[in-house]
Each structure stands twice: as C-alpha cells, then as structure tokens.
C-alpha cells in the first residue's frame, strides 16, 4: 500500500501592512488514486463514495465527477504540458468529514513510471465563500530547485483566494518529494516584497484501522475546523483594518 496519513502543522504569516500569524495542527490523507476503491474497506467509519463519518467523494475534487479522478488528472497534465503521466498519481488532501469537505489546497504528485521521483505537481486551489476551483500544473522543466528531492516553482497568481491579498502577486512555491515527511512552503511577493507565507510540515503515519480511528477522534471535525479558522482569521484582519480587495469578477460587474 502506498496510501498513508500525514500529520503535523500548518503555519500562516502575514508580514504587511498588518502583521498576523497563526499555526495549528491537522492531518491529511495521502491517497494513491489506484488504491482508492478498496482503501477504506478496513474501517467501518470510512468509505469510498458512500455516506459515512469520513468518506471520499469524487465530486469534491478536480474535474468532471463522471470521469475517474485518476483519468481526469492525467488528462489535465497532458493538456497543459503535452506529456501524459505514466506512473502513479498520489493526492494529499482532506476527505469529507461529517458531510462537509473543503480543501484550501490539494496536491497531486505525478510520479514517473518507475515510481522513484515526482515528475509533475498539480496544486488544486479552492476558495470560500465563492466555492471556485483552480489548478496550477507544475512540470519538471520549470523546477528551479538544485536538490533532487525538492521542487521550486515561481509563477504568477491566476485565481482569487483571499480578499486581503490583491491579484498582482508572484508565488514562490517549494515542495519536498513525499517520503517520511512532507514539506510545502509558499511565499507571496507583491512588487518584489514579501507579503505572506504559508508552510506545511507533516510526518508520515501508516494507514491502518487503528490510525484511522485515532485521527477521527483527535480531529473530529477536520474540514469544519479549517473553514472556521479561515473566517476567524478574516475577522482578525478586519479588526486590524487590513486592506480589502474585492473578487475580480465583482469588480468587472
């Protein structure tokens, strides 16, 4: 089995014009898409495409829900890069818990045929309250990191996420290839100056019946917690009189 659980912390830091910082513990599922249909047969409270306390629902993730996620993701990469992934595809994400799912960011790692290195990373972003989605497809040819176990991609913001960050932003994303740990670090630059960063520091846990029970009890409302903290931090920024930027579509209307 290649699927597993990753547990650790997420940290956000805003440097200007009103400093703000928070950090909290969380867990993610790391899912080999080929293993999905039978992955949760080991636990009665977890399921695939069936109502349960914890469940994977195809419609919560990228693409047409009538097309298998594995196929949809490979089609996306081929359409963007001209090369179809020919190895495993593994997804770092949240599932649906107690009927609720929200993923600020999910990461698809597309491995080579030998399953030894990540060739392409797809970052799927969701926003709230607009419930929109957008994918950044990051090919190996644009990797700027000198280490074979890390990736670095610099690219322009294309999708509205936060009303407290303007659209004219450059991203600097660094990711470590998943192994015993996962590291993700994203920096937002505005006019060449650091505005914000976000970091994930996660450690691998074996996916078994006991571990699935433990994370349900330790993080009983994982995705609800994510959304609640998003709005709590938004309130803090409002109270600090942080500048507000409307959704670009609303500006145009």
Residues covered by each model-derived region:
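Mature, function-bearing regions of proteins
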Residues: 1-253
